């Protein structure tokens, strides 16, 4: 995953296929923890559009990571916006949040209708799922 902090406090995270290894997953969670170490509130914008075939084992690892995050005294993540375009990713997210509720509100936007020009267009014209902590 690539973390783009140029619009901080909005942090865009773009996934290209993976994670495909434990090392990639660990890099992802370490970047997330670095944001917490800054002790500044932020919002994630996850772009999973290019994610094709992530391994199911990372759903369990992600739920364990969320559980670990919940032990933090202060939650710096204010909300997550997740862009998806496949049912597989949606099912994996549903499974993660069934096992472990999120640390902050999550908004999932299914953008099956192709690329859009802005996040505002996505939010206005996409099917949305909301998950509360």
Q: Whereabouts are the PLM-identified features?
A:
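Amphipathic, Lys/Arg-enriched alpha-helical "gate/interface" segment within cytosolic domains
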Residues: 1-133
């Amino acid at each position: 995953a690539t973390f783009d902090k140029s619009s901080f406090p909005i942090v865009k995270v773009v996934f290209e296929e993976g994670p495909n290894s434990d090392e990639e997953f660990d890099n992802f969670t370490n970047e997330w923890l670095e944001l917490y170490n800054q002790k500044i509130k932020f919002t994630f914008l996850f772009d999973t559009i290019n994610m094709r075939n992530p391994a199911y084992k990372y759903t369990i690892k992600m739920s364990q990571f969320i559980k670990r995050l919940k032990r933090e005294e202060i939650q710096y993540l204010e909300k997550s916006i997740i862009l998806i375009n496949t049912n597989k990713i949606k099912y994996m997210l549903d499974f993660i949040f069934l096992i472990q509720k999120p640390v902050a509100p999550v908004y999932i936007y299914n953008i099956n209708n192709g690329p859009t020009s802005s996040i505002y267009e996505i939010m206005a014209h996409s099917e949305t799922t909301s998950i509360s902590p």
